[in-house]
Amino acid sequence: MASGGVVKKEIGGNHDVVRFGVNDSVKGDLAPPHPLQASVHKEAKFWADKKRFGAEAIYGSAFNIRKDLDAQILSKFQRPPGALPSSMLGYEALTGSLDDFGFEDYLNYAAASEDGWVLGRGALELLLGGTAYTQATSAPQISLSMQQVQRRELQLVAVSAMLIDCKYEEIWAPEVNDFIFISDSAYTREQILAMEKGILNKLQWNLTIPTPYVFIMMLSASADNKSDKENAEALKFKRLSQSRQQLIDWSVKIKVSKEHGGFMRFIQVSCLGASASSSRMLRAKAAGEESVLKEFPEPLRLLISHRQSMGTCILNFHSRIQPVYVVDVAAAIVNSLKDDGTSMGKSYGLGGPEIYTVHDLAELMYETICEWPRYIDVPLPIARAIASPES
């Protein structure tokens, strides 16, 4: 997979460990052919080009997927008398109480509904793809994960979150009146601005969060997607398959993506050592692997090295980590898309050339940002007691 001293070691079954050297050069067209700015510019040009792929086509495609999501998710529980799938422009059609639906099922439905509405309206407004992506991933988190939101206010949260993200991403952000228009005057200016303030206060103004959007577009370009329409479809299905495991069921999302995208292979990026008995993060990875296997019996699994010492946690400065360069991981993904299918059904462990302790990485981080270390050594039981509410 890489030249210049790559070491492969069999660790049992179909698992291979691929260790990348520091100065390894990667074979083939692994680096994205387009620089970052060119990729973003390409996406911006696509959204502004109505002739190549009109906003109406995007809206119609999103609406069809949204209807299927309604059927998939609502079929999991009994629909109360008179309850109808919500339309793309509102949630008032969804009737019945939360007790009838079940709170977890309601979260599933609400998250998918909000994503569907955002997808269509964001495309209609011809915003930058990054804006629509950020808004589609942040609005459900704000409305469903961080606080309780009434059913009739879900669309208001989506509109206000879109306003925030436009101010953050766009050079010229739309006015509040534009959002009143796209919501069919369902909310007033005062309601939208009040919800905007509420969201910002809830987030404590922490808006700078990393998203996979740029990496998705770079990988899409490096996978020889010639059409901007293909890039948009890939971005759309990626949004539908976000790893909000507690909000939307994995198997439902993968099934929808598989049926609409016609995928022939599935590549899953997970962690080494993921199991039901691991830490919470690794347990989530293990649950994701189990859900993937339900729809794709033989996926290609790329397992990134997480920690070498099992049973330890991030609080333990002696925990060992073998980080791998993200470009090497991206190269492995791109190469797996270009092979003849022989890699399907196998698992590859990806690890870097060096092994560090958590203490080493902390020292490196503070040295890089030119700040004095802000940690103290405490006994591990005390550290666990302090961190237990957040774990």
UniProtKB/Swiss-Prot annotation:
GO terms of biological process kind: cell division; G1/S transition of mitotic cell cycle
Database matches in InterPro entries: ComplexI_NDUFA9_subunit, Cyclin-like_sf, Cyclin_N, NAD(P)-bd_dom_sf
Recorded GO MF terms: cyclin-dependent protein serine/threonine kinase regulator activity
Highest taxon of source: Eukaryota
GO cellular component: cyclin-dependent protein kinase holoenzyme complex; cytoplasm; nucleus
Keyword Cell cycle applies: yes
UniProtKB keywords: Cell cycle, Cell division, Cyclin
Gene3D superfamilies recorded: Cyclin-like, NAD(P)-binding Rossmann-like Domain
Pfam families: Cyclin_N (PF00134), UMP1 (PF05348)
SUPFAM superfamilies xrefs: Cyclin-like (SSF47954), NAD(P)-binding Rossmann-fold domains (SSF51735)
Family the entry assigns: Belongs to the cyclin family. Cyclin AB subfamily.
Protein name: Cyclin-B1-2
Gene name, Swiss-Prot/TrEMBL: CYCB1-2
